[in-house]
Amino acid sequence: MRADEIEGVLAFLRAAERLKTVMRSGWTSEGQQESVAEHTWRLCLMAMLLYGHTPGIDLARLLKMCLIHDLGEAIGGDVPAPAQKAGVSKADQERSDLVQLIAPLPPALRREIIELWDEYEAAGSPEAKVAKGLDKLETILQHNQGKNPANFDYAFNLDYGQRYTAADPIMSALRERLDAETARRARDEAIPRRRADLD
């Protein structure tokens, strides 16, 4: 790698550092808002632990997709699924932001990242389908585990990302357990609110 390419990689890494402070809609079990970087870390951990249960998956490709799937949010931030507006393409904006973010990288790395992101977004390969499904499951897991605000909408998660988790047996099994946790959490959180309304 040439000196100018090394500088480009460093410039990209400095810009990508923003993901450590871009907040998501989930909260940690300690009551702190989760960052995009934290979500990506656990998504990669899930991919590493579960990829062997889906035949024909290339782990390196799967992990790369998991690492880059939210990179564009370093520029545009995270837009939670319930807050997305009809007629506005989150994917188009994220891709545009991603292109801007990776501009300092050498051409071959830019091409690889864009190709991986496009494949992920289209769910166009076994790896992309697993990455998409695990992305949804990690989000639900965090919502179930976190200390969320009092008005948190757990019911939304019962339908969230179903099409990405239904076809794979291991993801379906995880989904079944997470949905049961979600329903229990929604019920348990609603009881104190109803009591407060009666007071």
Label the predicted regions:
Residues M1-D199:
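Alpha-helical, largely C-terminal catalytic domains
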